[in-house]
Amino acid sequence: MLHTIGILIWIIIKILVIVVPLLISVAYLTYAERKVIGYIQVRIGPNRVGLKGLLQPFADLLKLITKEIIVPTRSNKYLFVIAPLFALVPSLVGWAVIPFQEGIVLANINAGVLYLFAMSSLGVYGVLIAGWASNSKYAMFGALRSTAQTVSYEIAMGFALVGVLLAAGSMNLTDIVNSQKGGMLHWWFIPLLPLFLVFWISGIAETNRAPFDLAEGESEIVAGFHVEYSGIGFALFFLSEYASMILISTVLAILFMGGWLSPFEGITFLDQIFFIVPGFVWLLLKISFFLFVYLWVRATFPRYRYDQLMRLGWKVLIPVTIVWLIVTALMVVAHVKPWF
């Protein structure tokens, strides 16, 4: 009995060690976004609350928590209230299989890639439930757009994952990282470059970020699926979006960019200088790079039209992944060096 309780407490501690820093990261990602976009637009960004505006995320959180939760009169009240949780939970449970370094992972399962793919697909249910339960045409339009978008880009993302499985020969994320040992030239983003780019673009679309944020199109459907939400409900949708951004960036770093591996591995004099840097620091740097590109893309590109979004998914990304899967299979059979 005591042994079981001890195991349970240890699991809870491991979950908190992952979730608490993640929530703090989400808070400061919103701050980073406002700062980066501010500098791109030749503005300063938030700089009033705390030193250089560093406490702004907590001020925003306090504001949202203290706001009234308004439930529309003709909405389905129970589904309306729990929909934000349906959106948030998949973006958190995906972290269970993410290895931060060799041996540092909550659940080192052999079907890690499949688990991540399944969890990333579940987030759309929260959006769909929110749109339907709100009993608002704007919310419903946003939810339907998001569902169609997710279905379209999940296919391309799935094919891109198959390419990694072909190359690494495993669905275990730790094994996939270890298959990229030998330095930057051995990372999968080089032989699988088209699949890497497709996965990256699909990840932006999956998280409903600009220029694929049609589900929230302010200029067309007010605020999309969360138009009726305020206070903590709105905050949870906000949280799920940014947590998903961090998760997609982490998956990109693990599958294509060597995860926690040093980029200087195999380069003797640089390897000797940077060998003291822990693996998880390299992983955090790679995640930060992908997150910065998320913000840069949002500030740079205009929103796609709905037909352009669908055309890109079905007529460009899916054919590209199918063709490159065939090329990858041929490279694996031919044992193309230094990757296979």
UniProtKB/Swiss-Prot annotation:
Top EC category: translocase
Function: NDH-1 shuttles electrons from NADH, via FMN and iron-sulfur (Fe-S) centers, to quinones in the respiratory chain. The immediate electron acceptor for the enzyme in this species is believed to be ubiquinone. Couples the redox reaction to proton translocation (for every two electrons transferred, four hydrogen ions are translocated across the cytoplasmic membrane), and thus conserves the redox energy in a proton gradient. This subunit may bind ubiquinone.
Residue ranges of the TM segments: 4-24, 78-98, 113-133, 151-171, 184-204, 244-264, 273-293, 316-336
Keywords: Cell inner membrane, Cell membrane, Membrane, NAD, Quinone, Translocase, Transmembrane, Transmembrane helix, Ubiquinone
Cellular localisation: Cell inner membrane
S-S pairs: none
Name of the molecule in the record: NADH-quinone oxidoreductase subunit H
Record's subunit section: NDH-1 is composed of 14 different subunits. Subunits NuoA, H, J, K, L, M, N constitute the membrane sector of the complex.
Bilayer disposition of the protein: Multi-pass membrane protein
Pfam families tied to this protein: NADHdh
HAMAP family assigned: NDH1_NuoH (MF_01350)
Family statement: Belongs to the complex I subunit 1 family.
Catalysed reactions listed for this entry: a quinone + NADH + 5 H(+)(in) = a quinol + NAD(+) + 4 H(+)(out)
Record GO cellular component, one term: plasma membrane
InterPro entries: NADH_UbQ_OxRdtase_su1/FPO (IPR001694), NADH_UbQ_OxRdtase_su1_CS (IPR018086)
Molecular functions (GO terms): NADH dehydrogenase activity; oxidoreductase activity, acting on NAD(P)H, quinone or similar compound as acceptor; quinone binding
The protein's Enzyme Commission number: 7.1.1.-
Gene it is expressed from: nuoH
Biological processes per GO annotation: aerobic respiration
NCBIfam families: PRK06076.1-2
PANTHER family for the chain: NADH DEHYDROGENASE SUBUNIT 1, NADH-UBIQUINONE OXIDOREDUCTASE CHAIN 1
Domain of life from the UniProt record: Bacteria
